[in-house]
Amino acid sequence: MNQFLGLNVNPRENFMLSVKHEMPYWLPCSLFDSSVTIIQHGLKERCDYGEDDWGVKWERKVMRADSFPVNHPLDSPDMVEDYPLPSPNKSRIMECAKKTASNIDRNRVVLVGDNGWGLFERTWLLMGMPRFFVWSFRYPDALKRLIERVAEIKIILTEWLITERGIDIIEYGDDWGMEDRLLLSLEKWRTFIKPWQAKLYRVAKDHDVFVSQHSDGRVENFIPRPHRDRRRYTEHSERM
């Protein structure tokens, strides 16, 4: 065990205490204690100008802002099966992660693998958000198949980050919420997103890897009610 700030614990050990809901010696903060390094696959999910690896074109129209998608190439249910999605097996895709992971002290640092844009985001970027919602009513099977194809790539990326780079945590990000509500109904989320989101989680759990899930917006409706009820949480926290 290496010391940090005179304590008999190092940043990695302290971080993992917090993740396991034990009492850390200090509040983990990677900006302060360098406890976390994030590695990313090399699949181009976004760019300032030009086309990403999924066939979506981007432009940065205001230099003080991020780039925005300017086309959504998938415009017909007939395109879903044969649309050329990127191959995650190319050596270029993982080269960035290899280089970063090889330069850190795994005894002192938690290694987090960033899976990239989530199932909802990546799917609506391919087709446009209005079309996503229209298809959820008119062409639900085509939408499910497209999400499935995206998820298959994301699963391969997760498996590679776990088995080849030995990450401790996989980070998934998908913006499901707006300022005051969900972007899609809870029923739609459970129908189209949840089945494959669960498979992404299962890949991590099968390898004893922790999951970090990010979402912008107000998404409390996804969280089972006992976890939002302070009295019940206090009463049953050990069982939860």
Language model feature labels by segment:
Residues 1-34, 60, 84-240:
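Active-site loop segments of alpha/beta catalytic cores
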Residues 35, 39-50:
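Short acidic, Pro/Gly- and aromatic-enriched capping/linker segments at domain boundaries
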Residues 61-83:
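Short, surface-exposed, low-complexity cationic segments
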Residues 55:
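Ligand-binding pocket scaffold of soluble enzyme catalytic domains
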Residues 31, 52, 73:
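Cofactor-binding catalytic cores of oxidoreductases
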